Amino acid sequence: MGVSKLDILYRRLLLTKLFIRGWGRPEDLKRLFEFRKMIGNRERCQNLVSSDYPVHIDKVEEQSDCKILDGHFVSPMAHYVPGIMPIESVIARFQFIVPKEWNSRYRPVCIHLAGTGDHHYWRRRTLMARPMIKEARMASLLLENPYYILLKPKDQVRSSLKNVSDLFVMGGALILESAALLHWLEREGYGPLGMTGISMGGHMASLAVSNWPKPMPLIPCLSWSTASGVFTTGVLSKSINWRELEKQYYTQTVYEEEIIHMLEYCGTDSFKMGHEFMKHFPSNEDKLTNLNLVSRTLNLDMRDQVVSPKHAECHHSGKASISATSKGQLLQDTAKVERLNQTLTTNKSCFASYNPQSLHLLSREQRRSNLQKESLIFMKGVMDECTHVANFSVPVDPSLIIVVQAKEDAYIPRTGVRSLQEIWPGCEIRYLEGGHISAYLFKQGLFRQAIYDAFERFLHKYAN
């Protein structure tokens, strides 16, 4: 399946750059990776936010068909990783849109997390929450993203996060903030409760639901299993300040000497395939301009991933096991298996062979090429560590998950990435024609229908 030309054109029209200041402070990355281990385990994470966590309502506005409540609370992230959030983001803000009348004895609420660039509430309120009031008498709670609008650092331009680490701070904050709001909604007598989001919002909703200890409808729209492809092979990768990332990776050895060793994710689409990437990346490539080339060099053109028994041991208990298809493939193609096993069982020390101290002996073109390779692999590694859903608990009931994905999405690559159906057995995936932008503009009705279907599925299965 090809990619949407509209997605590519739309990205070219946007001039903003991502991660203009680089990776973020190494000490911040270390703290975030340690925190990821905590929130990646539901048994540990579910106790981080108490059931009586304080939430405050600031304003109530009565309208003809609904009430609109604005509220705030202190982000729990500020308690667990103090000092890592910008001061502007410490106070989380939300808007709660409640129908004047309900269709039944239930009072369903869906939390909507924001996608990239979705500042404030008006877009989600207009395109999703208002129609949901009219169509299904369903309430919507819109949580503002950290780093957006009132929560945006003063020196940040629009949605352009300054550091790679900012994305991980945002994700950790949204997981804990969602838990605080879910507890509050339960205290107020609402239910059933579910979560959704479009693009980045869908991915953040997936991570939040993975840590909720009860069955919950989840409807991630235009998102997939990891953000690593978004920032290495998707069209957004063209907006990244790679020069600064490469420079920092070269000048600060802490990234390869310490931080790489903290990366634990080892699925079949792991960054440990980087050894194969090193072998095949063309030495004369000066810019990351060909996304298909990047996909090939990251081994993303392999339709069926296989994994060695030794590698399978690195999965945490509860992760999806190797499929029968993969086992069959293992027997069919010995040469391919040997090459992959060598790649997949290579430990993190493979990066140490590319010592920045020795790069001065190479030609300028070779140094540039090697830095590109290592920076791209490191980006995949840190993104998989903090965003891959396989690094988090499986939601309590995957049958309540309906994923809506665009077939030609150039923002969210699926090639070479583990399928959500493999990670969440029993979930449903609905594919739409077209790409990311066209789906966002014209398929909101299908997103809402998926929400209604998931909530109906919950009531059919769990209603008293």
UniProtKB/Swiss-Prot annotation:
Pfam families: ABHD18. Keywords: Glycoprotein, Secreted, Signal. The keyword Protease does not apply. It comes from the Eukaryota. Its main location: secreted. The keyword Signal applies. It is found in: Secreted. Glycans are attached at N341. InterPro entries: AB_hydrolase_fold, ABHD18. One of its GO terms (cellular component) is extracellular region. Residues 1-24 form the signal peptide. Belongs to the AB hydrolase superfamily. PANTHER family: PROTEIN ABHD18. This is Protein ABHD18. The lineage of its organism: Eukaryota, Metazoa, Chordata, Craniata, Vertebrata. The gene is Abhd18.
